[in-house]
From Swiss-Prot:
Keyword list, A-Z: Cytoplasm, Exonuclease, Hydrolase, Nuclease
Record carries keyword Cell inner membrane: no
Listed InterPro entries: Exonuc_VII_S, Exonuc_VII_ssu_sf
Listed EC numbers: 3.1.11.6
Catalytic reaction equation(s): Exonucleolytic cleavage in either 5'- to 3'- or 3'- to 5'-direction to yield nucleoside 5'-phosphates
Family: Belongs to the XseB family.
Function in brief: Bidirectionally degrades single-stranded DNA into large acid-insoluble oligonucleotides, which are then degraded further into small acid-soluble oligonucleotides.
SUPFAM superfamilies: XseB-like (SSF116842)
Assembly: Heterooligomer composed of large and small subunits.
Entry GO MF terms: exodeoxyribonuclease VII activity
Protein name: Exodeoxyribonuclease 7 small subunit
Listed GO biological process terms: DNA catabolic process
Length: 76
């Protein structure tokens, strides 16, 4: 799966695949291929969300409060 997709692009592709599968007129082999691709997109989205959660935890700090920003060398 292309990891360079943005979260929004991956969700859009996933929604498109789900829509195709929900129509119910997809041949079995094609449906399996769509399902596999959808699972990969789902995993990619999950990884991106976890990454954002980790970034937010760093930004907010352990107590959930916004940490003050200090520029490099600005240790006053």
């Amino acid at each position: 799966m292309e990891n360079k997709l943005s979260f929004e692009e991956a969700i859009s592709q996933l929604e498109h695949l789900v829509s195709k599968l929900e129509q119910g007129d997809v041949p079995l082999e094609e449906a399996i291929s769509y399902f596999k691709e959808g699972m990969e997109l789902s995993k990619l989205c999950d990884e991106k969300l976890k990454n954002v959660q980790e970034q937010m935890a760093v930004i907010l700090g352990e107590d959930g409060e916004l940490e003050p920003f200090t520029a490099l060398g600005d240790e006053a």
